[in-house]
Design a protein with these regions (language model features):
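Rossmann-like NAD(P)(H) cofactor-binding subdomain of soluble oxidoreductases
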Residues: 85-147
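Glycine-rich helix-loop-beta junction characteristic of Rossmann-like nucleotide cofactor-binding loops
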Residues: 1-2, 105
């Protein structure tokens, strides 16, 4: 499999997601970024706030949007949303909302990577079970899951 022919979707364009999006795009991948923050989207689309290490790579294939439907074009989805802590427990509300929004656009044979910080076992416990229930997708048969 030649991965550079694959399209990558990155959900969450903050401190982790934006640099990852720029780096993947600078290496030749087509990258679609999703965020609900207009400023983050504008920074990507106007090529402002590019990490200094990636200056000069402004002409890469990278677009950002709030619209999850553009994820229909991607083969790899990386989730980089915050999981702030409350009472020493991660708040998974944002991750759960993303999974709800994402479920209709995850294709068979996709790779889903959860980059967000979650407790050990949470990816398997929540994400795997959610996709089985909502889509009937079985991990390692219908899609691949990494964390």
């Amino acid at each position: 499999m030649i991965y550079k022919e694959k399209n990558i979707g990155i959900i969450g364009l903050g401190y982790v997601g934006a640099p990852l999006a720029y780096l993947a795009a600078s290496k030749g991948y087509n990258v679609i970024g999703i965020d609900n923050d207009d400023t983050a989207i504008e920074n990507i689309n106007k090529r402002t706030n590019i990490p200094k290490e990636l200056k000069g790579f402004e002409n890469f294939k990278l677009v950002a949007s709030k619209d999850y439907t553009i994820l229909q074009k991607v083969d790899i989805i990386i989730v980089c949303v915050p999981t702030p802590t409350k009472n020493n427990k991660p708040d998974l509300t944002i991750l759960k909302n993303v999974m709800q929004d994402l479920k209709d656009f995850l294709k068979r044979d996709s790779l889903l990577i959860i980059e967000s910080t979650v407790a050990p076992g949470m990816t398997k416990q929540y994400v795997k079970d959610f996709l089985l229930k909502e889509k009937g997708f079985i991990v390692n048969e219908d899609y691949n899951l990494a964390y």
